[in-house]
């Protein structure tokens, strides 16, 4: 337990002066993100103390570090205290500073032959069904991919995939040339410890493309078939076999794929065990938790990937996905979805009752 000893007025003035002096010394702290109201004297019982509130740093300011070396002076705080960030986590913070979408970067060293033609064909079929009469439907594949910003002209004037295009339509073995830790994994597990899993598919199997769009389609089918929700009825009396729960699940999966840091370790992991589904992606959220739950400002790490999902009616560009998930689960009277924001492992995990 702690005992409040209190400070004198003179001590408060001195500590405030010393604190601000240190905080504004660039040899000691990389950036001062505090304002005057964050440091103020307060009364606890009959004792005076100095209260310091440290706000969450905006992604444009991260990393905020001690000393002059970000690799040795960047710390994060979790429920157990402060811990030194890995160099990988620090590099991810620098990458997240950019406002320009990183997933539209052109991969000059690749041609469009690294993309899977069957994936593109399947995507275009869905696109045409949803957007009949759209002018893009008449385009050749190369032009269509350019409209999606899945491809662009490289320095030589020929076409190359963008990062979004490679991840969305590419072959897994070519994706790992850019993202060595890239791995997409879906498992169906049971409580029998003698059985590792009931079903599994992952991006390194070799008998399918391994890209994020085909992974999404494969996993969506498995999840849709197992979700026990009642049929919904339209006003005309006909029933429909898809309700908000299915849409919310699709959005949760698409959001994980669009918000993932593909340079991070361990990749995407989706696990279904009994009535629980967990969806985990590398990369922490780029907004505050309050903004995350409020919706309207999702700030995706890979916005063009989210846009390509949006063209086939998956995902919410406006950032209302969390609200949709919460509402859908509440309507079914299911357990409230849980988000785990792991600072140590730089991952976000969503746990759902299905």
Locations of the language-model features?
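Conserved N-box helix within the HATPase_c
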Residues: 248
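Active-site alpha-helix of zinc metalloproteases
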Residues: 251
């Amino acid at each position: 337990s702690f005992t409040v000893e209190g400070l004198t007025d003179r001590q408060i003035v001195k500590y405030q002066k010393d604190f601000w002096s240190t905080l504004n010394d660039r040899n000691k702290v990389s950036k001062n993100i505090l304002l005057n109201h964050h440091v103020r004297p307060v009364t606890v019982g009959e004792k005076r103390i100095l209260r310091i509130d440290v706000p969450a740093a905006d992604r444009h300011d991260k990393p905020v570090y001690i000393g002059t070396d970000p690799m040795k002076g960047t710390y994060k705080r979790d429920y157990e205290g402060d811990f030194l960030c890995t160099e990988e986590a620090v590099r991810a913070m620098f990458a997240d500073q950019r406002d320009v979408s990183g997933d539209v970067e052109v991969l000059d060293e690749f041609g469009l032959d690294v993309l899977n033609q069957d994936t593109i064909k399947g995507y275009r079929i869905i696109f045409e069904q949803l957007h009949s009469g759209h002018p893009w439907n008449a385009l050749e594949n190369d032009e269509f991919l350019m409209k999606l910003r899945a491809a662009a002209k490289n320095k030589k004037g020929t076409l190359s995939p963008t990062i979004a295009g490679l991840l969305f339509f590419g072959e897994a073995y070519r994706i790992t040339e850019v993202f060595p830790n890239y791995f997409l994994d879906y498992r169906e597990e049971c409580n029998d410890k003698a059985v590792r899993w009931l079903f599994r598919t992952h991006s390194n199997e070799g008998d399918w493309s391994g890209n994020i769009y085909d992974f999404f389609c494969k996993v969506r089918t498995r999840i849709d078939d197992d979700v026990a929700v009642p049929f919904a009825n339209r006003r005309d009396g006909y029933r429909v076999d898809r309700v908000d729960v299915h849409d919310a699940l699709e959005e949760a999966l698409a959001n994980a794929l669009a918000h993932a840091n593909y340079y991070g370790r361990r990749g995407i992991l989706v696990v279904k065990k009994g009535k629980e589904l967990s969806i985990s992606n590398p990369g922490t959220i780029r907004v505050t938790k309050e903004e995350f739950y409020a919706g309207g400002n999702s700030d995706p790490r890979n916005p063009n990937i989210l846009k390509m999902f949006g063209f086939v009616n998956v995902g919410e560009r406006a950032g209302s996905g969390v609200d949709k998930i919460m509402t859908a689960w509440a309507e079914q009277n299911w357990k409230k979805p849980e988000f785990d924001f792991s600072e140590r492992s730089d991952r976000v995990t969503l746990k759902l009752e299905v």
